Amino acid sequence: MANFFDLDGPSFGPKSGGKPRRLVLLLHGLGADGNDLIGLAPYFAEALPDCAFVSPHAPFPCDMAPYGRQWFSLQDRSPETVLAGVQAAAPILDAYISAQRDRLGLADRDLALLGFSQGTMMSLYVALRRPQAIAGIVGYSGALVAPHLLAGEVKSKPPVLLVHGDADQIVPFQAMGAAARALQGAGVAVDTLARPGLPHSIDEEGIAAGIEFLSRCLTAA
């Protein structure tokens, strides 16, 4: 069984060259690895110069491609199977978040999660079940797994920004609205940004919104 000691991946910053005062974990999607999102870090670092960025490779080899990693399998996309996969990976990610926090001597309020696709699903599932609220979550092109369970399992309520393209051919655009409704129903503050014509990707406007959101969350922390 993988554990948080098995997770590694590229890192960036702090841009200031000083001791990290904030931490952002970037969680990639299915079939990618940590190198997929670490390229976002320099853009975010312009607004967050004292922030360290870590982009771990997901714990499991991708079973739908000859390369890449996955947080959980999507060969069977039934809600029950997806939930079981998320629940299996959740303790690994949860322990990794805590280990990275402790390594830098930070508190939960000093860290944020940024996810893409599967990384968004994992971010939302894990962060909202941690006993202490992190500073915030940015979720690109993702979904909320098991929304019917959230209200009964939520332990903390960090603010969330969801960004999704309305031409997404992988994760339906409607997933953003469904996630927002469930999050709001559980008392979580949610901002949403729809990107016209954008497929399963992240664009400049989405990056800019993420920078503004995390700057606000981490500065207020």
How would you name each of these model-derived features?
Residues 109, 155-160, 186-189:
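Short, proline-enriched alpha-helix->beta-strand connector loops that line the catalytic pocket
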Residues 169-175:
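Conserved alpha/beta-hydrolase "acid-adjacent" motif
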Residues 109-156:
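Primarily recognizes the serine-hydrolase "nucleophile elbow" in alpha/beta-hydrolase
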Residues 177-221:
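C-terminal catalytic histidine-bearing segment of alpha/beta-hydrolase fold enzymes
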Residues 56-57, 114, 138-141, 163, ...:
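Alpha/beta-hydrolase-fold catalytic nucleophile elbow
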